[in-house]
Amino acid sequence: MIGKTNALSAAGVELSLVVSVTSGAAVTATKSGKTVTGTATGGSCVLKLPEAGTWSVSATLNGQTSNTQSVSVKDSYAVSLTFFSATITVTVDSGASVALKKDGATVQTKTSTGTAVFTVTETGTYTIIATKSGQSVSGTVNVVSSTTTYALTLSFVSSTLNNNEWSVIKSVSDAGQGASYWSIGDRKAATLNGTVGALTLSNVTTYAFIIGFNHNASVEGANRIHFQLGKTALSGGTDVALCDSKYNSQVSATGYFSMNSSATNSGGWNSSQMRTKICGTSLSSYSGTIIAVIPAALRAVLKSVTKYTNNTGNSSAASAVTATTDYFFLLSEYEVFGSTTYANSNEASKQAQYSYYSAGNSKVKYNHSATSTAVRWWLRSPRAGSSAAFVIVGTDGTVGGRNAFYSLGFAPGFCV
């Protein structure tokens, strides 16, 4: 604020410039090579100016420079100067050492009490690094305004998979370090809400479980943790597949958990209604698919995966095995059993058995809404010697086949 006083200038009379600024600040006024300085006490500094005219006024304190005011002094004037100040609140585990850095240099260090609050005196990008028990996490904050309060949450990795946010799981996956923290079969809760195909789910909590770390990475993509849905509990419980009201029945409409609406495997996995309408192929348009019913936090960290499958259908040719890019996918015969009985045997050259199943874990799954009832569940591999069927896992956990228009159990995989 600049204010004019009632004092009048006269020849040989000094003009007063009253500067309101933080106590201890060094105040400087300059004009055409002339400089007047002073130090603020009690929140202000009075400068005696030798002449009228336009003066530039600024202040410094603890290495910080205030805004600069340009004042046209004819009489005596008052001006206010402010220093830039913004707050960054970091939420992180109590006891963590939190360092604030800018341009590679450490600006401040604090110990978190659940939060660590930093006051910064200039704009720019700040890096915050929290360290506890030998583990470090970091994030950045871009400070552009003194009127904004900035916040950052940092999370350490827990060795209990379910205690981690999906974003933390992704960061571990990005670094290719999943196996350093967790084990095959570890579980993470996911609450399903909405409609997938013809099945409406309301607050149904299932547990996604890890089936592979960097599985078949040279083909499918590196730095991925592979999961499958789902189990009924964080420990113990039952392996389940989602089943709609037409389970084990023939259906002639799309939208049920059938591979197709007719008894055909033409076009294989790539063209199946299971892939396009139930699993979904896009993160921007996914209404009615499994992508629509998973938590938003999981949807935000999904990674695409390259899957090779017989995408012709009734074929044993190597050329029939081609790639698709998927977010949710059915497992193949080889990925579950480590061998091919009904699928095109050339699929095996582009696939690998998932660690979860190679370890001998059960392949039997139960109806998610009737957990004492074992169900058949779909695999994405077409039966190579049939124009009508895809491969399935039977109620006893053995491999089989079923015509594509049957609605069966849905137990998809995905990657983070």
Which positions does each model-derived feature cover?
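Short, low-complexity N-terminal tether/leader segments at secretion or assembly junctions of large
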Residues: 1-16, 82-85, 146, 155
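A short, amphipathic beta-strand motif
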Residues: 13-23, 86-92
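Short, acidic Ser/Thr/Gly-rich low-complexity loop/linker segments typical of extracellular
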Residues: 31-46, 103-116
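A short, solvent-exposed beta-strand micro-motif common in secreted/extracellular proteins
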Residues: 47, 51-63, 118, 122-134
